[in-house]
Amino acid sequence: MTIERLDHVSVVVDDLAAAIAFFTALGMALEGQAPVEGPWVDRVNGLESVQVDIVMMRTPDGHGRLELTKFRNPQLVEIEPATAPPNALGLRSVMFTVESVDDTVARLRANGAELVGEVAQYEDKYRLCYVRGPAGIIVALAEELS
């Protein structure tokens, strides 16, 4: 038996509207949103009385999806440091291929993003950077060079 596909990546955020604006500015489309709760959600999460609002964002090619989750109950648990560096254990980043790193960074900065380091070129293949997005997550951007 083998996996069929990567369905989505989930990011817990504290400001759903800001996260939607950020990923829309990146170029993703809102696929849907809904409140989610019930015994099955409690069992999946291993928590009691879970109430969340979820939003699904889709990449332009339709192959990638990002779930933005805002917990109403139980309260969010903040990790330290909230702006963990790229070498922190756990999920490091989510990377998107973009047409122009510079244009994308400018759009994302207008939505609160900050560069983690700087834009750098890898050989004659890519221009790359990390930006810090909603809830402190690191979003990697890659521009393929011809």
Give the label of every model feature segment:
Residues 61, 70-72:
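Short glycine-rich, polar/acidic loop-and-turn segments at beta strand-coil junctions
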Residues 15-16, 73, 101:
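A generic "binding-loop/recognition-motif" signal
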Residues 12-63, 110, 129:
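Core segments of cupin and vicinal oxygen chelate
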Residues 72-77, 88:
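Glycine-rich, pocket-lining loop/helix-strand segments that form or immediately flank
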